Amino acid sequence: MQFTMLRYGFEDRPPRPIIQVVAKKILVVEDTKSIREIVAFMLRSKGYETVESGDGQDAEAKVRADPPDLIVLDAMLPRKTGFDVCQSLKGDEKFKKIPILMLTAITRDTGKSDEYWKEKSQADDFMSKPFKATELVERIERLLAK
């Protein structure tokens, strides 16, 4: 048995094809920098590519320029609210299928349920702050699997 290192590496057979895994891209939109960075870090540690934005207008521009696979979106944002961004994207044929998970403290402040705000915003899911990291990841994975 002869080993051909230049042609096949360390084996006497052709190499297996390389499988290229492309990470899902998630846009994290949150005006509180520390929360935005924590969520983005957590998602990167799970293998996702992240893009960050601190306001609604910038977030919508990023989606229109390079659509992500999913958006984690705060409701209360400067320049354009998360509700407005969500409704604008869901009303656009090109972007309406991008899953949006709204992550906000608004339910705590108003006393209304997550389901109420999910329906009002047109988001695919709605999660209240404070949140558990494991639950956030589970919901993101569920939305991406659809």
Q: What are these model-derived regions, one by one?
A:
Residues 30:
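Conserved acidic carboxylate
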Residues 55-58, 81-87:
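Acidic catalytic/metal-coordinating carboxylates
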Residues 84, 107-127, 134, 138-141:
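Alpha4 helix (beta4-alpha4-beta5 surface) of REC/receiver domains from two-component response regulators
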Residues 36, 78, 96, 108, ...:
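The feature encodes the CheY-like receiver
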Residues 67-72, 77:
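Active-site beta3 strand of CheY-like receiver
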Residues 47-54, 62:
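Short hydrophobic/Thr-rich beta-strand motif most characteristic of the beta2 strand and flanking loop
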Residues 37-45:
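Charged docking surfaces used in two-component/phosphorelay signaling
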